Amino acid sequence: MPTAVIESLDHEGRGIARVEGKAVFIEGGLPGETVEYRVLRSKPNYEQAEATRIVRRSALRVAPRCPHFGVCGGCSMQHLDTLAQAATKQRVLEDALWRIGKVKPGIIYSAIQGPAWGYRYRARLGVRLVPAKGGVLIGFHERRSSYIADLGVCPVLPAHVSALLPALKVLVASLSIADRLPQIEVAVSEATTVLVFRNLLALKKADEAQLRSFAETHGVQVWLQPEGPDSIVPLHPRSGPGLTYTLPEFDVALDFRATDFTQVNVHINRLLIRRAMQLLQPAPGERIADLFCGLGNFSLPIARRGATVVGVEGSEALVARALENARRNGLDSRTEFHAANLFDATEDSLAALGPLDKLLIDPPREGAIAVVKAVGPAQQPARIVYVSCNPATLARDAAVLVHEKGYVLRGAGIANMFPQTSHVESIALFERP
C-alpha cells in the first residue's frame, strides 16, 4: 500500500496529501498523519483515496461515537476533535473567500459553537426495502453511494428520535406499502415530534392502524405526504400541538410545519441570530430588508429591536407562515412580507422595496448573485449581513460586493451548525467605507 503525509483537510473533510506532484484526497486522514491508502479513483491531476491504516496518528484524532461512522455518509468528521472541526471549517471559509473572491475579512469572528451531539432537530431519513440485506433499511445515504445505510442508532439526532430507529424499521416492514415509502421526514420542536411518511401509494386501513398505534406508543405525531411538501396531512392525532421553536432573547415564537425549511440546530440558530443582530445593529426608525426570509427567523428579531422589516421569500407558503408568525408575536405593524423569486432580482425589483438602511441576506446554497448584482445607485444599504451555507457562493458574491459595489468585508466567521460533518455555515458583514 502507498503511504502519504496529510497536509490539510478539504471542504469535504478529506485529507489532502501530495504524492509525486499529484494531489491525493484521502478519506479518513487528518493533518499531520502518515497513512497508508487505497486509490478509489485516479485522474490526471488528482486521486481520490481512502485511508486503510494510520501509521502515525494525530493528537486531534478521537474515537468516533457512532458505530456506523465510515459507512454512513451523514457524518464525515467524527474522528476529529470538535474544536478542531470548527478550526478546519474556519480555514475552509477563509480559503474560499481568498481563492474564489480574492477578499479577506478585516477580522475573524469567533466560531459559534453548541452541543456536538443530539442537535439535529430536522432530518430526512431514507427508507428502502432490501430483502437481501435483511429487510427494511432506514437512515442516511452511505458514503459515496445512493444506498441507504442501515442505522441502529444516530447520535446526532435527538436521543428519543435515535431510539426510535429500530422500532421504525419494524413498523415499515409491517406495512403493505413498505416498498413504496421512500422517506420519513423528522421534525422536532420543544414540545412535539412529527414523523412525516412519504407514501407513494394509498394506505390500507390496517396500515393506518399500525401507524396510529406507533404514534400512541411512542408519543409522536404521524403525518402522511402523498404528493409534494404541501400535501402533508395528520394521521394521528388528527389535531394536536403544532411545531414551534422559540427565540427567548427576542421574545419570539415561530410556528412551522414539518416540511417547512427551518434550521436543524436550534441552539446554533439562536446564537447565529444573536450574532446577526450584533452585526446588523437594527434600530427604531430604520428600514431593513430580510431577503430569503423564510418564515421570519431573522425578520421578527429585527422587528423586535424596533426596525421596520421588509421580508422577501420565494415560497408563498413560507410567506404566509411569516405573516402569521408576525401577527402572533404582535409584530405585524412593523413587518411586511412578499413572495418573489430572488434569483431573478434586478435593480428595479430591489428599488421597488423602497429605501433600505440595511440588508440581511440568508440564501440557500446557490447564493445570492442576482441580489448582490442588483445593489446599485437606487439601493445602497450602508450595511449588509450575509448568512451563508456555502463558502463558495459566499466568496463569489463577496467578490461582487467588494470589487464591483465598493463594500468592505469587515468580518466573517463560521457557525458550527452541523457538528461531525464538513458542512460550513458562516456569517459575514459588509459595510460601505
From Swiss-Prot:
Protein function: Catalyzes the formation of 5-methyl-uridine at position 1939 (m5U1939) in 23S rRNA.
GO molecular function, one term: rRNA (uridine-C5-)-methyltransferase activity
SUPFAM superfamilies registered for this protein in UniProt: Nucleic acid-binding proteins, S-adenosyl-L-methionine-dependent methyltransferases
Pfam families to which the protein is assigned, alphabetical: TRAM, tRNA_U5-meth_tr
CDD domains: AdoMet_MTases
Binding site for [4Fe-4S] cluster: 66, 72, 75, 154
GO BP: rRNA base methylation
Disulfide cysteine pairs (residue numbers): none
Location of the TRAM domain: 1-53
Name of the protein this chain belongs to: 23S rRNA (uracil(1939)-C(5))-methyltransferase RlmD
Keywords recorded for this protein, A-Z: 4Fe-4S, Iron, Iron-sulfur, Metal-binding, Methyltransferase, rRNA processing, S-adenosyl-L-methionine, Transferase
Domain of life: Bacteria
Reactions it catalyzes: uridine(1939) in 23S rRNA + S-adenosyl-L-methionine = 5-methyluridine(1939) in 23S rRNA + S-adenosyl-L-homocysteine + H(+)
Residues that bind S-adenosyl-L-methionine: 263, 292, 297, 313, 341, 362
NCBIfam families documented for this protein: PRK13168.1 (NF009639), rumA (TIGR00479)
Family, as annotated: Belongs to the class I-like SAM-binding methyltransferase superfamily. RNA M5U methyltransferase family. RlmD subfamily.
Organism: Azoarcus sp. (strain BH72)
Gene name of the encoded protein: rlmD
Lineage of source species: Bacteria, Pseudomonadati, Pseudomonadota, Betaproteobacteria, Rhodocyclales
Enzyme class: transferase
Catalytic machinery residues: 389
Enzyme Commission no: 2.1.1.190
